[in-house]
């Protein structure tokens, strides 16, 4: 199972993204493509344009979370038929986490700024569940609560052999910061393994903002990125083999 997550920066360089998908071998045979900051160009969803470039065997779903400077900003999932046969995808709102669980300074900040609308896409089949997430830029404990909303949703669903949570966590700041360790502890407590933990940078600022988590039994994985200059984020890949040794 090959998974890629990529914040495509509102598709500002959509032609470069399409070129990469068509020409780079890393995208060949991709099973799941999780997109953040997907937009609409020429009346078409970015995900539709990218899926078309990937070939006839791909399907897509895109949902707008908010308008960013008047442009649609949302999440999308592209999947390869045969590798994944989901029912109709659903939206999980990440907009209203529990403020009472946050420090007072952070609660004050979040009330003062214009609210950000954030969502996760959930797609599932009897064999697999996938979440495409995009957490807020602002806030620390806020991000933990947004991610916890995904974890809570997953826990309420029937158990499946494989769950993938992938996306842009916006984890700006030193990787050893206590709050980022809290985020890592939250996912670990839920049985989610960060298969991209060895990757050092996923953004032009040289920070790691993007990740892929896996919840399963025994599995092996490897992860890598490409520096394509088609977005401010790098695409992040993981090959996951269930039952591997």
Language model regions located:
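Structured beta-strand-rich core segments of catalytic domains in phosphoester-bond hydrolases
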Residues: 32, 36-127, 226-227
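Metal-dependent phosphoester-hydrolase catalytic domains
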Residues: 83-89, 141, 145, 154-164, ...
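Alpha-helical structural signal in soluble globular domains
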Residues: 49-57, 153, 182-186
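Acidic-and-aromatic substrate-binding clefts and catalytic sites of carbohydrate-active enzymes
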Residues: 10-15, 39-43, 67-70, 139-141, ...
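Active-site beta-strand/loop signature of hydrolases that rely on acidic residues for catalysis
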Residues: 2-8, 21-46, 78, 129-134, ...
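Soluble or luminal CAZymes and related metallo-dependent hydrolases
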Residues: 12-17, 42-46, 113-117, 141-149, ...
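Internal catalytic-core helix/loop-beta-alpha segment
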Residues: 109-124, 131, 136-140, 144, ...
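Short aromatic-enriched loop/helix-cap "lid" or pocket-rim segments at secondary-structure transitions
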Residues: 16-18, 45-48, 72-74, 101, ...
